[in-house]
């Protein structure tokens, strides 16, 4: 309810953090155009259930180590230096995909982008292993909803492009 309160105006972020040193944090940013925010608003306006289905933040923080994490910038600048003039993933995403006025092109482009990042990520990388654990959890949550009788045609999962192809297959 707080996220869709009239008192809370985007942009805003939810921050999860550890309580013991060294302090680690995760930020979940929300802008007016954020798919997650729009999904929450839609669910509220249409009296539908809306649930987060990622791993709990304390588990994610437990899996992460700052020194071991691959940065988004490294993926594009080191793996694909000649494929893009962008120097970071956020800039590439914003200028190449986010500003598309064609929804089909946006969906196709974001799917291709996510699959390309997955393909270029080393399967032994700790962040990839962490993401695989997260995706397995998300799949399990979706299966639980299906087992509870939720219609598969009425389940919508909002994920980042990197996770979409992994989540689409419930195997």
Language-model segments: residues:
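Compositional signal for N-terminal targeting/processing segments
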Residues: 1-171
């Amino acid at each position: 309810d707080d996220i869709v309160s009239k008192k809370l105006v985007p942009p805003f972020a939810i921050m999860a953090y550890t309580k013991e040193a060294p302090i680690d944090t995760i930020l979940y940013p929300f802008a007016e155009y954020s798919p997650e925010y729009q999904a929450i608003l839609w669910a509220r306006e249409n009296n539908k259930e809306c649930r987060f289905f990622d791993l709990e933040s304390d588990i994610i923080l437990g899996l992460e180590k700052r020194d071991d994490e691959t940065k988004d910038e490294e993926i594009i600048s080191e793996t694909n230096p000649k494929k893009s003039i962008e120097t970071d993933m956020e800039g590439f995403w914003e200028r190449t995909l986010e500003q598309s006025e064609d929804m089909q092109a946006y969906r196709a482009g974001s799917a291709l982008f996510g699959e390309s990042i997955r393909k270029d990520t080393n399967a032994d990388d700790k962040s990839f292993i962490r993401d695989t654990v997260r995706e397995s959890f998300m799949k399990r949550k979706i299966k639980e909803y299906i087992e509870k009788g939720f219609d598969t045609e009425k389940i919508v999962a909002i994920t980042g492009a990197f996770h979409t192809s992994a989540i689409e297959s419930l195997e």
